[in-house]
Regions:
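Class I SAM-dependent methyltransferase "Motif I" SAM/SAH-binding loop
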Residues: 41-46, 124
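Conserved acetyl-CoA-binding loop of GNAT-fold acetyltransferases
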Residues: 59
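A conserved beta-strand element that flanks and buttresses the S-adenosyl-L-methionine
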Residues: 120
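Gly/Ala-rich phosphate-binding loop of Rossmann-like dinucleotide-binding domains
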Residues: 55-56
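Short amphipathic alpha-helical interaction patches enriched in hydrophobic/aromatic residues
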Residues: 15, 123-124
Length: 219
């Protein structure tokens, strides 16, 4: 499971350097990949402006986020009208084309993500450690049954297991976890200055790689 205490403290103390004030450059560049889709899944969504951008594009946005602070900030900062509901042991907020579940992503059922055909993942793969990423890949396969496309801007600084969160996600790992069911393509790769904390852990490079996952016909 993600380190909920770590992330909760970050939100509580407003230590959210990972939060962006505008949509991600790769989402802007590749938004038309979603033109034939209607409903998109945004895991560990925080209060990301990416969701506003996706909604303005015409997509119904289904998010999941464990931090109530993040969800309430998202609603307030964007002047949204969303109503709080409860189903099973899950809380969710719905309205204005958004539905955001509050809680553990792995407690969602297939019915909660019915109709979702695409996913924008800027936050979850890099938040999960290696074993959690295995569980997450299985979750997408088992729960998001109609998923055919994923756009994922990820971080890559090699196989440095204890450097995170955010964690490194390599091409080798993605092929092991998703290669059977998805065609994987690098859409862009941006080198970034190697941070000292990563260098001290053995990393020799740091980059942001935007991946496209397209479901194989027989995948």
């Amino acid at each position: 499971m993600p380190d909920y205490q770590f992330w909760s403290e970050r939100w509580l103390n407003n230590q959210i350097g990972f939060h962006m004030n505008g949509p991600h450059k790769s989402l802007i560049e590749f938004i038309d990949l979603f033109k034939v889709h209607k409903k998109i899944f945004v895991p560990l969504c925080g209060k990301s402006p990416d969701m506003i951008f996706l909604r303005q594009y015409g997509l119904e946005v289904i998010g999941v986020e464990f931090s109530e602070i993040a969800i309430l900030d998202f609603i307030k900062e964007n002047n949204l009208k969303m109503i709080k509901h409860e189903v099973r042991d899950l809380i969710f907020y719905e309205g204005d084309g958004f539905k955001i579940y509050q809680g553990n992503l792995f407690k969602l059922f297939e019915i909660d993500l019915a109709g979702v055909t695409c996913c924008y993942d800027r936050a979850s793969m890099v938040a999960f450690n290696q074993q959690e990423r295995v569980n997450y890949s299985q979750f997408l396969k088992d729960i998001v049954k109609d998923l055919t496309l994923i756009l994922a801007p990820l971080l890559d600084y090699g196989e440095v297991l204890d450097a995170g969160p955010p964690f490194s996600v390599t091409a080798r790992e993605l092929n092991l976890l998703y290669g059977k069911n998805f065609e994987l393509e690098v859409l862009r790769s941006d080198e970034t200055p190697l941070r000292d904390n990563l260098k001290s852990k053995g990393a020799i490079y740091e980059k942001e790689v935007t991946w496209l996952f397209k479901k194989k016909i027989n995948g």
